[in-house]
Amino acid sequence: AHDENMGALKYFYDDAPAPIICTRFTKHVIETQFNFNTLRIPLEFKVIPPTSALEIAGRKFHFFQTSHNAAYSFGVAIETSKGNIVYTSDFIVDYSVKIPAYIFDMKALSVLSERPTFLLMSESKGANHEGYCSPHHRVTPLIEKYFSNANKRIFIDCFWQNFFRISEIIDLCIENNKKIFFYNDFT
């Protein structure tokens, strides 16, 4: 849940109100964004776990957690008579992630694969490269040397909704006995 992915919500929700199906984390991001922009539109949320199933308008929707730099992101598969229509935003499969908010639910995806897939809509950047991609969501290997070498302050600019990266920075601060001060337009 990044604000650039939901920017249109404030423009059309009044004209086409419907429940916003999301995780608790995404609900918080949406509410924060609307409060920051002083938009007082009453929103209806349907909060779900990242891996779950729901019936909407007579169709079965299956949600499965993916790994992304936004916590509890998910893809969705919609059952149809011809097979599943599957949508995922950008994600990676990182088997080393131990934080529950960022674990790819391979088991849920495996269960979905037991039915035919009629249409797959997924990011494909880098699909033409063999092997594995680098976990681009990790910043620790790139900046930890600055923490161990710094005698004074370190300033870091980071996207406020990238909680994976923020948690890495907090961990580095704790490991290197650095004080933390957060600043953004909300503080």
For the regions a protein language model found, what residue spans apply to each?
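His/Asp/Glu-rich metal-coordinating catalytic cores
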Residues: 2-185
